[in-house]
């Protein structure tokens, strides 16, 4: 009975605005620690296979994937000196020594404009939905995290998708508000309102199952660790461990969709930025079949280790910071209640 009533009590003690503050702090910290890993990865990729002018590549700040346009052949929009790196550690050392430590966060500020609000919406919706589901059907409390996680991710992805598409368009050339409005109106007139959600399908196919698996496993691992260490509320270490484990499991299971989503995301981005192209983007399932034909079934699981290196720490940092923030506000609210008595 304790496990069913605890989330409801938590929802009473913590307001949605406090959940939003906790999630925004988690988002900022996650971006701060995870972005350097992806910047180094991009630099190593550019060294082995230079980006072609006008092509897209995917940049991750630990919260969201973002399409980025290579505006010239040497990639100097992203870094001042090309560099010749012998590996990941050498890349970190050389970038800091030759370009300054700030270069490890290249491209981060513009992506935070959408990543932080999307994360705030996602985490706040999850907690609110989970509490509502537990109250409305306490006998099925074990599936509340599964349903809430999938629904919250679906909402946040749907809300952010048009904004990400607009940001991608604006990378190709600066647009005034009038030009941007005309561009959007033209796309809608040609393909309907669904034109604003191009690329939404593969994003949802990856992120919704990932979110459902992540939250379900996170709650299970967290509950198990809390019972093992005889604590009602998760410590920072418990949240960190549960986040890393559940994030890794979800990343492995949904990897085929991540491979397809990345390829389709780049394809759709290039079509959107170069609207004169007559090429039509392939469907998600056609891309999946093409990958299997080209590289075998194993092609759908390409990049497993890099994905785990990125996802596990991002999930661990985000959820442990979020839980710490909620714990802080819970104690603060309890102290205020005691003072008012």
Curated annotation (Swiss-Prot):
InterPro entries linked to this entry: Mit_carrier, Mitochondrial_sb/sol_carrier, Mt_carrier_dom_sf, Mtm1-like
Transmembrane segments: 20-40, 104-124, 143-163, 200-221, 236-256, 299-319
Start and stop residues of the Solcar repeats: 14-132, 140-224, 234-328
Topology versus the membrane: Multi-pass membrane protein
PROSITE patterns: SOLCAR
Subcellular location: Mitochondrion inner membrane
Keywords recorded for this protein, A-Z: Membrane, Mitochondrion, Mitochondrion inner membrane, Repeat, Transmembrane, Transmembrane helix, Transport
Keyword check for Protein biosynthesis: no
Known catalytic reactions: glutathione(in) = glutathione(out)
Gene Ontology cellular component annotations, sorted alphabetically: mitochondrial inner membrane
Organism domain of life: Eukaryota
GO-annotated biological processes: mitochondrial transmembrane transport
Main localisation: mitochondrion
Gene3D superfamilies assigned to the protein according to its UniProt record, in alphabetical order: Mitochondrial carrier domain
Chain coiled-coil ranges: none
Keyword match Oxidoreductase: no
Role description: Probable mitochondrial transporter required for glutathione import into mitochondria. Glutathione, which plays key roles in oxidative metabolism, is produced exclusively in the cytosol and is imported in many organelles. Mitochondrial glutathione is required for the activity and stability of proteins containing iron-sulfur clusters.
PANTHER family, A to Z: FI19922P1-RELATED (PTHR45760), MITOCHONDRIAL GLUTATHIONE TRANSPORTER SLC25A40-RELATED (PTHR45760:SF5)
Family membership noted in the UniProt record: Belongs to the mitochondrial carrier (TC 2.A.29) family.
Name the UniProt record assigns to this protein: Mitochondrial glutathione transporter SLC25A40
Gene: slc25a40
